[in-house]
């Protein structure tokens, strides 16, 4: 299998089945981060992931990490915390601040480059990328963002500045997503944090089948309209 060099003059991608086994899922390099190319990528189970100074790299790993929202794992300690939660959770109130928080919360660096931030801000302006914000009073203490594909949500990154803030974002989002027809959350690559919340690995082929079906299923009307999803317990 060869790594494919993308053309700037075409937004077409090779089949994900041609991705490398090592490193797992690396499919192509180059191209750009235009909205049209990014949307084409997500529609085919592909996402960008690269470090500052590297070329744009495109991935479709096998297996794929996913979370069925109804299978979110709510631990006893998290349930106790949430029942007395000090947090307010909103949808699409502060996308720029959320992606900036995701880019800057890791001491060891981040894959969210300036170019990535600008590209996903454009997707947000076009109605394809969305954020969930967690607030304590007026302070943004956590959140997550991703890209919508019908009844499937492609989670990109999350951050937390206070206890259980990112868990709260995902917990509240899962409940709201289910109520409005959401079926599956793409977590891309499994890690210990997402695994602890209920994410599992499935074969890439199965993920692509789910994607093809779910991206044709719309969520309830006006689901992505900015609004408050959860208020702190009194």
UniProtKB/Swiss-Prot annotation:
Assigned EC number: 2.3.2.6
Pfam families reported for this sequence: Leu_Phe_trans (PF03588)
NCBIfam families found in the cross-reference section: aat
GO BP, sorted A to Z: protein catabolic process
Compartments in which it is found: Cytoplasm
Gene Ontology CC terms, in alphabetical order: cytoplasm
Signal peptide: none
Keyword Metal-binding recorded: no
Function (record text): Functions in the N-end rule pathway of protein degradation where it conjugates Leu, Phe and, less efficiently, Met from aminoacyl-tRNAs to the N-termini of proteins containing an N-terminal arginine or lysine.
Reaction it catalyzes: N-terminal L-lysyl-[protein] + L-leucyl-tRNA(Leu) = N-terminal L-leucyl-L-lysyl-[protein] + tRNA(Leu) + H(+); N-terminal L-arginyl-[protein] + L-leucyl-tRNA(Leu) = N-terminal L-leucyl-L-arginyl-[protein] + tRNA(Leu) + H(+); L-phenylalanyl-tRNA(Phe) + an N-terminal L-alpha-aminoacyl-[protein] = an N-terminal L-phenylalanyl-L-alpha-aminoacyl-[protein] + tRNA(Phe)
Similarity field: Belongs to the L/F-transferase family.
Identification of the protein by name: Leucyl/phenylalanyl-tRNA--protein transferase
The entry's keywords: Acyltransferase, Cytoplasm, Transferase
Stored Gene3D superfamilies: Leucyl/phenylalanyl-tRNA-protein transferase, C-terminal domain, Leucyl/phenylalanyl-tRNA-protein transferase, N-terminal domain
Gene Ontology terms for molecular function: leucyl-tRNA--protein transferase activity
Species per Swiss-Prot/TrEMBL record: Salmonella paratyphi B (strain ATCC BAA-1250 / SPB7)
């Amino acid at each position: 299998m060869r790594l494919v060099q993308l053309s700037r003059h075409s937004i077409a991608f090779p089949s994900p089945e041609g991705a490398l086994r090592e490193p797992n899922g690396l499919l192509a390099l180059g191209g750009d981060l235009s909205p049209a190319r990014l949307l084409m990528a997500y529609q085919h189970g592909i996402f960008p992931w690269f470090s500052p100074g590297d070329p744009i790299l495109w991935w479709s790993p096998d297996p794929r990490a996913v979370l069925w929202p109804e299978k979110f794992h709510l631990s006893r300690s998290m349930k106790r915390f949430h029942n007395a939660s000090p947090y307010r959770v909103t949808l699409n109130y502060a996308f720029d601040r959320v992606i900036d928080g995701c880019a800057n919360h890791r001491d060891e660096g981040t894959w969210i480059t300036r170019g990535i931030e600008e590209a996903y801000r454009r997707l947000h302006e076009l109605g394809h990328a969305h954020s969930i914000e967690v607030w304590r009073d007026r302070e943004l203490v956590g959140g997550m963002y991703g890209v919508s594909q019908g009844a499937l949500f492609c989670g990109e990154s999350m951050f937390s500045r206070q206890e259980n803030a990112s868990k709260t974002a995902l917990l509240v989002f899962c409940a709201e997503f289910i109520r409005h027809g959401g079926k599956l959350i793409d977590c891309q690559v499994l890690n210990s944090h997402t695994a602890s919340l209920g994410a599992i690995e499935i074969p890439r082929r199965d993920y692509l089948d789910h994607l093809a079906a779910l991206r044709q299923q719309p969520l309830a009307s006006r689901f992505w309209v900015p609004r408050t999803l959860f208020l702190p317990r009194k």
